[in-house]
Amino acid sequence: MAIDFKQDILAPVAQDFAAMDQFINEGISSKVALVMSVSKHVVEAGGKRMRPIMCLLAAYACGETNLKHAQKLAAIIEMLHTATLVHDDVVDESGLRRGRPTANATWNNQTAVLVGDFLIARAFDLLVDLDNMILLKDFSTGTCEIAEGEVLQLQAQHQPDTTEDIYLQIIHGKTSRLFELATEGAAILAGKPEYREPLRRFAGHFGNAFQIIDDILDYTSDADTLGKNIGDDLMEGKPTLPLIAAMQNTQGEQRDLIRRSIATGGTSQLEQVIAIVQNSGALDYCHKRATEETERALQALEILPESTYRQALVNLTRLALDRIQ
């Protein structure tokens, strides 16, 4: 039976989700009109808001009863996520995000960077309101690690010798770490330290699977579905897992073509590279790795007591994998 996002995932925290939106709207308020305009633009471009939903579900799965604290933490997660996307778009020179013009394309790089900084600062301002030093320390360290992941990705650009281990380090920092903050933070907030590690492992494996799936879709989907241009990763010279696996499975001219494409970037040979990726067994390997990460995520969840909220986290995990079924 197909999983319905609204009914099987969002419904248990729908009221809290609406309250979280209010915290976000308050969080992006500013005396500077341009800051508010840009913040509103990027926040409204949000997708399904999986990270704050995961945060709310994890909080309730841990037995959290303080609704306002959980709602505020979810808003903090979404503001941090939005800030990283704004900065990503500047670094990647992206003009499109989820089918909408990016902040840097609509205004300019300088404005986008500064508003991203504002969103991070405001998120920590809200975090201080929660009055929990363990939570504050976790988020401070985690935010540094997210930035380090982005720098690692920058270092790996145009480097065809990037290994799968390095790729996993990159995606842990740039993607999985914020998922970990969302769920581990919920356990801290709920005063349930025994659930910190299981929820961190769940979110880490979920984030890995989620990013691998995203990287698969860059070679199998279309611009309308992705909300960005097909082949963006290749154009930017990013050695993602489909390319790394394709190089492992090929030799001679095919392997050399992928290496050159990573080294130079651009999309002049995109069709040939897509064909090699699709015919080399690389996508099968990526699918296998995404499935393994998903299974590990689900195993970690088993430590939590049974509840509607835990089941919704299971549903979310399975739905993420369904994107490539």
UniProtKB/Swiss-Prot annotation:
SUPFAM superfamilies: Terpenoid synthases (SSF48576)
GO MF assignments: all-trans-nonaprenyl-diphosphate synthase (geranyl-diphosphate specific) activity; metal ion binding
Residues the entry annotates as binding isopentenyl diphosphate: 48, 51, 81, 98
Role noted for this protein: catalyzes the sequential condensation of isopentenyl diphosphate (IPP) with the allylic substrate to give solanesyl diphosphate. Could be important to determine the side chain length of ubiquinone.
Record-listed E.C. numbers: 2.5.1.84
Residues annotated as binding an all-trans-polyprenyl diphosphate: 97, 174-175, 211, 228
Catalyzed reactions per annotation: 7 isopentenyl diphosphate + (2E)-geranyl diphosphate = all-trans-nonaprenyl diphosphate + 7 diphosphate
Origin species: Rhodobacter capsulatus
Binding site for Mg(2+) 2: 88, 92
Gene Ontology terms: biological process: isoprenoid biosynthetic process; ubiquinone biosynthetic process
Keyword field contains Nucleotide-binding: no
Top EC class, one word: transferase
Name under which the protein is recorded: All-trans-nonaprenyl-diphosphate synthase (geranyl-diphosphate specific)
Family: Belongs to the FPP/GGPP synthase family.
